[in-house]
Amino acid sequence: RIDSEVLATIFYAEPARAIGINSIRGDFGALFLAMSLFTLVGSFGSQRWLLIPSVFLVLVIVGRMTSFILDDLPMVLASSLVMELIFLIVLVLALISNYLKSDSTENRSFFRVFFNQRMLIALGTVLVLIMGAFWGHEKIGIGLWNRAVEQRTNQNTIARLSDGLHVGLAGTGAPIPDTKRVGVSTFVIAGSSLFVVDTGPGSTRKLELMQVPLGRIDAVLLTHFHSDHIGDLGELMLKAWTTGARTKPLHVIGPVGVDRVVYGFNQAYALDSDYRTLHHGPTVADSRGAGGVSQSIDLKDKASTAIVFQNADLKVSAFLVDHRPVSSAFGYRFDYKGRSVVISGDTLPDEALRREAQNVDLLLHEVLNPEMLLTMNRAAARSGRNVVRNVTHDILDYHTFPEEAARIARDANARHLVFHHFIPPVPMAILHRAFLGNSRQYFDGPITMGVEGMLFSLPAHSNAIEKGWLLQ
C-alpha cells in the first residue's frame, strides 16, 4: 500500500503542512502563469469555465495565507498575493456581470448555485476565520505548539513496528546541492537490532524527525569515505550519545581507513563532549559514551564477504563493489527471518553486487542519469564554470545508470528496486519518468524513486513489502 502522505511526498506536496500547498504552486509555476493568462482572457468571455480559475485562485490564495500563518513564509505573500487577488476580483466581477446580463434561464440557474444566501454566508464565515487566525495568531500558535509537543512526545511509530526487516530512507541525495534531499543515509531495523548505513550531511536531523531511537543504534555501517557518506558522522555520534544516555561509544564499521575517520570525528567533537558532560552531568552525558569506536573490515577480493554482525535470526554481510579510485567500497546485505535487503553503496555495475543481491526482497541502488548530467556539463561549459564541467564529466565513470541498475535487479531476481543517491538532483516528480530512462524495459518489478521519510516494511516469514511514512 502507499499512504497518502507517501504519494504526496513523491509529488513534493505535503498535505499535512501548509508549505505543501505552496510547493505545488512552486513546482508547477508555468501552470500558474498559464492560469493568469487564462484569467485575463476569461474575464472578457461569458463562459461557465470562468469558475474554474476562480476556484483555483481561491485555493492558491488560501494556501499562501495558510503558509504564512503556519510556516512563517512572508516572502511568498506580498507581490504574488496582490496579483492573485487582483485576478480573483476580476474573475468574480466578470462572473457577476455574466450573471446579470445572462438571458438564458439555464445560465441563470447555473450561476445562482454560486451566488445565493448560503454561499455568501459560507464565504463570509471563511473570511472571518481567516481574519481571526491573523488577529489571534499568538494564542492559536501557543495552542498548536502545546498540542504538537504532546502528540510528538507520545508518538513512537518505530516501537509499534511488527517483527521483520524495516528499511527507512533518511537521506537520498548526493553531493550536488538539492533543495529536496539531504546526504545519503539509510536505517535498517531487524527485530530489536538497529543499524544506520552511511551518514550523509543533514541525515541525522532526518533520523530524529523520523523518530529513530538513536541511542539504540547497534552500529553505523559505512560504505566508503566520500564526504557525502560520512559528513554527519560526528553529529550522529553526538546525538546517539546525548539523546540515548549511552555509556558506550557508537560502534562504527567500515572498510580499511575507518579508524582514521572515526578518530578525526572524535577529535573534532572532543571539546563539545566535555562541555556536554560539564553542563548535563553523567546522567545525560556520561563521558564513557562519547564519540565512536571503529571496526575495520579488510576484504581482499570480490569473491570474499565478511559477516559484520550475526545472531540467531540476523546476518549482516559486507562485500566489495567497484567505486574506483576508492580503494575499498562496500555494499551490505541484511538477512532476517526469511527477508532480505541489499544496499549497493556507490558503485559501477558490479558482478559482486549482482551475486550478493540474488533473490533479495529489496534492492536499494545508487543511480546516475547520464543524459541529465551531461546537460549540466554542457551548461557549465557554456557559462565558463570549468570546475563544475570537469566534475560532472569525471563522475560519469564510477556510478550506475538507471538501466544498468534495472538489469542488475533483473539478473539478481530482486523483488523491488529502490533508487536513492540521485545524481543529478530530481527536483520535481514530473522528471521521474525521464530520470528512469528505459529502466522498466529491463526490470518488470516495482521501481521506486526514494524520498526521505519512506519506510519499507518486510514482515518476518512473509512475501509482503509494505510502504509507510515516518516524516511528520
What is each residue range found by the language model?
Residues 87-104:
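Membrane-water interface at the C-terminal end of transmembrane alpha helices
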Residues 1-18:
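Hydrophobic transmembrane helix segments
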Residues 73-84:
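Non-cytosolic membrane-interface motifs at loop->transmembrane helix junctions
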Residues 107-133, 331, 340-342, 348-452:
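Cap/insert and terminal regions of metallo-dependent hydrolase folds
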Residues 103-341, 430-463, 471:
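Binuclear metal-dependent hydrolase catalytic cores
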Residues 19-40, 55:
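Core segments of alpha-helical transmembrane spans in multipass integral membrane proteins
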Residues 46-56:
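Membrane-interfacial loop-to-transmembrane alpha-helix junctions, especially the N-terminal start
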Residues 56-66:
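Aromatic-anchored segments of alpha-helical transmembrane domains
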